Amino acid sequence: MRDPAFPGAAMAYHPFHAPRPADFPMSAFLAAAQPSFFPALTLPPAALGKPLSDPSLAGAAEAGLHLSALGHHHQAAHLRSLKSLEPEEEVDDDPKVNLEAKELWDQFHKIGTEMVITKSGRRMFPPFKVRVSGLDKKAKYILLMDIVAADDCRYKFHNSRWMVAGKADPEMPKRMYIHPDSPATGEQWMAKPVAFHKLKLTNNISDKHGFTILNSMHKYQPRFHIVRANDILKLPYSTFRTYVFPETDFIAVTAYQNDKITQLKIDHNPFAKGFRDTGNGRREKRKQLSLPSLRMYEEQCKADRDGAESDASSCDPAPGRDSLHSPLSAAPSPLRLHRTNREEKFGADSDQELDRREVRSARGHSPVGHRSPPSSPRLEDRGKDKSTPEKKSDSPESRKDGGSGGDSLFNSIRSLEKDKVESRRKEDSKSDPECGSLSKETYSPLMVQTESPPHLSASHLQSLAFSGLHGQQFFNPLNAGQPLFFHPGQFTMGPGAFSAMGMGHLLASMTGAGALDNGSLSSVQGASGAATPFPFHLSQHMLASQGIPMPAFGGLFPYPYTYMAAAAAAASAMPATSAATTMPRNPFLSSTRPRLRFNPYQIPVGIPPCSNLLTTGMPGSINPGSESSKPGSSRESSPIPDTPGHKRSHSKSLSPKASMKDSINELQRIQRLVSGLERQREVSPGRESPK
């Protein structure tokens, strides 16, 4: 029920001593409005009468307060003596109330004030704030407010103005908002303006937070009440002095209807950031990053910072994230690459360019987070091949054409090796066409290393019983310091060598076992066309002299035997032909991705910088200063930098005087194996390794 208001007065004052029960049901005061004080307090309408003077009647009213509902822990605190519930002695006061920010309220009122209501509750703007005067300084007062319907109409905003759209909806439960400082003395209330800025409006009829419940598209009038009482329990039978300010009426909406109201809120409310074009929030920062000028600036800064680095190196994961990488994942996840790429390159040209960078970086770089220097030949070559279409790394053509980019590759090798590389490249162009399937780094030492691009193509590594090893951390037992170097032409392995070390069935299970039965395994040294024998079964005392601990079963693999040989033991019992024919059907053995899902501990044993396992044990074209041994190379993630002593440890180059007949025989065997494996690969091209 709306209280009468006097339009000509700046302050409407209407005291009423005996309100009807429908005006102020006690549930509006206590049941929901102040749950922390009165969780389940209900009062009958009769309790809203005049102050009780008879002590017996006061006791009856106290019994009607249902104090038992307050819980046992509240009973002692809220039980009042009859004297405390008696009215206070009469105090001569004449309260006067003035509305704060009246000019701002008038601006809103001329246009038609709107207040947004939400399910979670929304504060009012302008906030309801008044200044009180004329109170007794010593007496205690309770200040509260409520919001009641201004009329019984429903409204709609049509043709830039509010119009009556019909009869009002059923009224929501009435709730009184008691100021949190109540009760307080008149002196305290008059010292500063009384603000109800914490009052929240909601349209949730089942609200449990004590918010004021309103209907959308209805007009409401806030009311301010002063009650002289020293206890909230006296509210039901105390005198209310109600003050109504007509300029504070508003229409409750779920979204602003009038653009002028929206602009007024933006101009005067410092918290109305949701409507502003500029701000410090995430939404505004996202808009700023999408501006073309800022995108160009981001690209320019990125280019200046990266210099000549390729796209793949800019897609490297952050160093903080590298410590969490498992060393057995063959390539970083494209999803992770996509996310980091979008985080680091806001100014990417298009989604198509992003996809190309993902594929290129997933093919070519090690996820161990070391950035490659601009002088890395593989990155330079990749940068020159940007304009060419993407090659499918799984197709046989791309593997056979792996050596076609040799001209552009060796142009960027350091000046110390130019002559040697030029001579090798010329000899390579004259060699057998099958040798072209060797990758671009054929003549660099074969680092038995993890997750790096293979020094041999996938087809040759399969023929060498290394299909599961060329992309995985398998041969790096120290995982730090200088890696083990094996030149492609420097191991000639017979089945006896593997069985002597306890690894025959292991390597036989990883690829077709026919390679082991055909005699000694060797790769082709493209420079001379000859294979140089190097005994693979290194003695334990030789490895111990280099500071390399040998595992229990005598092999070079530093991992527990049960991890690797459990699945391989069954495969070793099969014939060579059956192992070769059933291999493509088994995803564990067919794919070139890593199979062994264990995470070995790093062995903190370092190799002396001046002594190398292969500089003393094997003669070969191993140049420790070559591109494979650069600490920042894209194929090596060794955290130990090169030392001058390591760079000075040169060995004599190999004399190409091996038997041509042996090399031709080995080449023919490898060619037969490659052709057979290629046919098997084409039968099942989409096979993926188990996750």
Swiss-Prot record:
Subcellular location: Nucleus
Ranges of biased composition (kind: Basic and acidic residues): 340-361, 378-402, 415-433, 678-691
Comp. bias intervals (Low complexity): 325-335, 624-639
Annotated DNA-binding residue span(s): 104-277
Cellular-component GO terms for this entry: chromatin; nucleus
GO BP annotation list: cell fate specification; positive regulation of DNA-templated transcription; regulation of transcription by RNA polymerase II
Coiled-coil intervals, chain numbering: 659-684
Single GO MF annotation: RNA polymerase II cis-regulatory region sequence-specific DNA binding
Region (Disordered): 301-440, 612-691
Keyword Nucleus part of the UniProt annotation: yes
Keywords for the protein's UniProt record, in alphabetical order: Coiled coil, DNA-binding, Nucleus, Transcription, Transcription regulation
Task performed by this protein: Transcription factor which acts as a transcriptional repressor. May also function as a transcriptional activator. Binds to the palindromic T site 5'-TTCACACCTAGGTGTGAA-3' DNA sequence, or a half-site, which are present in the regulatory region of several genes.
Domain remark in the UniProt entry: Repression domain 1 (RD1) is involved in transcriptional repression.
Assembly, per entry: Binds DNA as a monomer.
Alphabetized PANTHER family for the sequence: T-BOX PROTEIN-RELATED (PTHR11267), T-BOX TRANSCRIPTION FACTOR TBX2 (PTHR11267:SF82)
Name this protein carries in UniProt: T-box transcription factor TBX2-B
Native species: Xenopus laevis (African clawed frog)
Native organism taxonomy: Eukaryota, Metazoa, Chordata, Craniata, Vertebrata
